[in-house]
Amino acid sequence: MATVMKKVDAVIVGFGWTGAIMAKELTEAGLNVLALERGPMQDTYPDGNYPQVIDELTYSVRKKLFQDISKETVTIRHSVNDIALPNRQLGAFLPGNGVGGAGLHWSGVHFRVDPIELRMRSHYEERYGKSFIPKDMTIQDFGVSYEELEPFFDFAEKVFGTSGQAWTVKGQLVGQGKGGNPYAPDRSNPFPLEAQKNTVSAQLFGKAATEVGYKPYNLPSANTSGPYTNPYGAQMGPCNFCGFCSGYVCYMYSKASPNVNILPALKPLPNFELRPNAHVLRVNLDSTKTKATGVTYVDGQGREIEQPADLVILGAFQLHNVRLMLLSGIGKPYDPVSGEGVVGRNFAYQNMATIKAFFDKDTHTNNFIGA
């Protein structure tokens, strides 16, 4: 029989970026907030200690900060006629494990959403006609505009300590000839920090791209180009271009993470609690099956715990949020044959493209620098 804990105002499942942001917002609103993280407690110190963290075998090969898919994984199939098989090799998507989640091991690339992406169906129908999009394509508009989201993007960049060069600010051109992105949407403020310096290889690429007519620009990154203190009082140090970003804890406190940028502001609060090693099994519902009443989880000792709450927020990795909703009987599961249902519909992930470049033997790219 499950042990029933004292009720809280809000329980958050997962403590990555989503969980940390929601915890800060809700505690500021005066709510008693409990965050449940299925993995262990981890932080820049001591888990990111130098030189132990500069260990490619532990992090790049054995993938210490990622979900251990030998213990738990998802199944994958390419069509409804295929047999669903367990994913046994991390590749496209990289769920995190432990406090910070994927926000601890990400690289720090910090683009804003393009306004067109928020109204993709309307954009293409206006441009190419309503018959352009295939009937079986489920693409749809988000229902929120870039203009509505812009103030939140602006504040998030201040929290993250994002480095970059704006193209326009309040309609005024400020980034031409300075590495700004001519395709970026307008901004209400410049980036909190100037863009990172370009390495020799980046300079070579930029020169070559410009010569053939492209418009290279400085990547916006949540990797600080200088010392920085965010609105929550969290301090960050300048990036030293070590190259151990994606898949690693940043020992320089230069890469934004929930652990560096938000957790220090939450720890002293009397209305916040973080419980690691708390693996949520399901969201509990009332008798009408339309309202969440809390969650049930298993703690580090294997005990089943029921945590009542007025508000339940699913802030785990996308795949795990959907799985929890399916296990809890929330919403109608998506049926790819009939097209009915919402839960699990429209899963999408980022596209990545790479190129290989060959140089003559007298071209040096400063190979010893990591980033």
Show where each model-derived region lies:
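FAD cofactor-binding and catalytic pocket of flavoenzymes
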Residues: 78-106, 112-126, 133, 142-146, ...
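Glycine-rich loop(s) and the adjacent beta-strand/alpha-helix scaffold that form part
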Residues: 25-28, 32, 39-56, 269, ...
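A short, glycine/Asx- and small/polar-enriched loop/turn
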Residues: 233, 286-293
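N-terminal Rossmann-like FAD-binding beta1-loop-alpha1 element of flavoenzymes
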Residues: 8-35
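Conserved N-terminal glycine-rich FAD pyrophosphate-binding loop of Rossmann-like flavoproteins
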Residues: 40-65, 96-98, 102-107
